[in-house]
Amino acid sequence: MQQNGRTYIAIDLKSFYASVECMERGLDPLTTNLVVADASRTEKTICLAVSPSLKAYGISGRARLFEVVERVKEVNAERRRKAGGNLFEKSCDAHELAVDPSRAVGYLVAPPQMAKYIQISTQIYNVYLKYIAPEDIHVYSIDEVMMDVTSYLETYHMTARELAKTMILDVLRTTGITATAGIGSNLYLCKVAMDIMAKHVQPDKDGVRIAELDEMSYREQLWAHRPLTDFWRVGRGYAKKLEAIGIYTMGDVARCSIGKPNEYYNEELLYRMFGINAELLIDHAWGWEPCRMQDIKAYRPETNSVCSGQVLQCPYSFEKARLVVREMAEAVALDLLEKKLVTDQLTLTVGYDIENTAGGSYHGETVTDRYGRKIPKHTHGTANLPRKTSSARSITDAVLGVYDTKVNPKLSIRRLTITANRLVGEDTVQQEPEAPVQFNLFDNVEVQEQRLQEEEAKLKRERKIQEAMLDIKKKFGKNAILNGGSYLDGATAKERNKQIGGHKA
């Protein structure tokens, strides 16, 4: 399983959030019907996880709660028909449901506990560190890692499969959570082996699922696989474009890439469609991936940004959403100050609600959302600041300026996103010479200099206030001190401060 002398393992924790909730309740994660979702929101809320036994009924791992409700109703209607018209007690256990057809399918709805999931994920990462050094582990997400295990196989006198199984069983003993693994001769192949192959292989005697791929076995086993969206980095947009020209599989992509210049299907066709990203698509179609672990560890982005976004619980009016935008801008400023970063460019994106088009009174530009519904096109605007700063006043004024001039006040609002771009460290700015101030013939230089001094004094006072707020929040919690606007109707900061990643902590 080595190409150019490298062997990689990817490990994915099975239905991680749902498994944590099952273990906390003393239930079997593999046989308990459970979804992780905030039922206090509407049934449109997204399920963060669905347990394997519930997925077996055809429920997506990222379903909306109402989709789970509807699908379970359908399943129970079919069970009722087969049982002669009556179903008795509900059961959330797959074994009980299989043995007793008269029982109705039930399921548990567990509210998210993001802090708990982070704690368990850290515990599992520490298990991996017993076997692999941190420089050879890439944490891909809260429930997924990739490892370069090349130098460890000889040390442990193990095959890659044996090492993967050893770590998975250790995680199971430590936390009760099961995992699947993919082994490959490069990072792409180990990821695809885990994502696609491991789900379909038979578990071994210990219940562990591990799949292996090299370039040749990848071509033999997955060149005809559908859908394309199962492959790493191929989203719905890519798949739709490829299918529009008759390309449905990775094998089709590979064949297209070696077409002659005078043929319709050739490499140039892919580059015209996807630009430079076609190179990665073609490499992956052939099972190639030049990126190594040291490349990931050495990577530093050319530009940095901080983004804050939220989906509102219900449609907000222009004025009500403006209050939330102010809260978000102030939070972004505090975040920058805490990280000792400054920005001179801010971007605001506002998404409108579906209700704006429901009555047929809206006649502006529309787009189609992922559910095929027509909604007003989002508003997007950028504000450039005269100097790099983390001042809440400067950032808030700039963002609200974009909001007031760009957003349609007649439309109800559902999504808000603020991005602080072109970030640099405070110390970097302090070392740069100040930009000269341009005066004209009619300016009173003394007055202008006085204004600049007053502005500097205001910024220093504001910074002290912001630093004091940060200290209070760190000691007593994020809600220990809030701006007055956060107590008004429609404000969201107080509730969001209790969340991690937009979900209950």
Feature names for model-found ranges:
Residues M146, N384, T417:
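Short aromatic/hydrophobic contact patches that present stacked aromatics
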Residues K14-F16, S40-K44, Y352-T357, L423-E426:
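Short, charged/polar surface micro-motifs in flexible loops or helix N-caps
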Residues G401, T405-D471:
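C-terminal hydrophobic structural anchor segments
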Residues Q3, A10, D230, Y238-I413:
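DNA-contacting surface of Y-family translesion DNA polymerases
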Residues S185-Y188, D283-A285, V342-I354, S412-V424, ...:
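A glycine-rich phosphate-binding loop feature that marks nucleotide/adenosyl-phosphate handling sites
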Residues A358-Y362, D427-P433, K494:
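Short conserved micro-motifs at the rims of enzyme active sites and ligand-binding pockets
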Residues M1-W286, P290-M293, L441, E446-A505:
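Gly/Gly-Pro- and Ser/Thr-rich, intrinsically disordered tail segments characteristic of DNA damage-repair
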